[in-house]
Amino acid sequence: MKIMLISGSHRMNSQSEKVAHYMAQSLLDNGQATATEVFSLAGNPLPLWDEGIWNGDAAWQALLNPLSEKLAASDGFVILSPEWHGQVPAGLKNFFLLWGSGELAHKPALIVSISSSDGGAYPVAELRMSSYKNNRICYLPEHLIIRNVESVLNADASKNNPETDRYFRERIVYAGGILSAYANALKGVRESGITHSDVFRFGM
């Protein structure tokens, strides 16, 4: 089972990417995935959507096809978003516009919101409300909000708040188990063929 983690921060060396790499290793260590991969939006590697995607533009195909294959080969996802001004970063919202060929469809995804303080709820609501319609990603009823992120999940234990760090490490294992179970279950749904339709390609 392969789980792909999407780190949605544009910043280099971001806290979101730190959490993504920690979670990728946690999934492996706890037998919740056999392979993981982190894809980071640091530095904006994906241009803003334009009609060239629909028209089969060669430059878009060269950029997206390798990533499309990795997404299609994944059984589930972890979507990590920092809270910027109470919002999901533009690059992460743009990410969801790029996949309309079933790469994400009917696959489970765990939302992980990242906050440097006590916030983090707004990205969860925004992603659940508006990022799934046409790509048909399936968000779990479980999510994580990693608050005061600078003080948890650091490799240097002296930088962690011991009690809070322990809580988030345990909660990540719990959520990873749910993601893994959903990934197994939804594989059967996709293989049944019931989700395939050339008539109803877009959500309502």
Language-model features, listed with the residues they occupy:
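N-terminal beta1-alpha1-beta2 submodule of the flavodoxin-like/Rossmannoid cofactor-binding fold
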Residues: 1-97, 160-173, 186-204
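Mobile beta-alpha loop/short-helix "lid" or hinge segments that flank ligand
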Residues: 37-48, 101, 134-158
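Acidic/histidine-enriched, beta-strand-rich ligand/metal-binding domains
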Residues: 90, 103-104
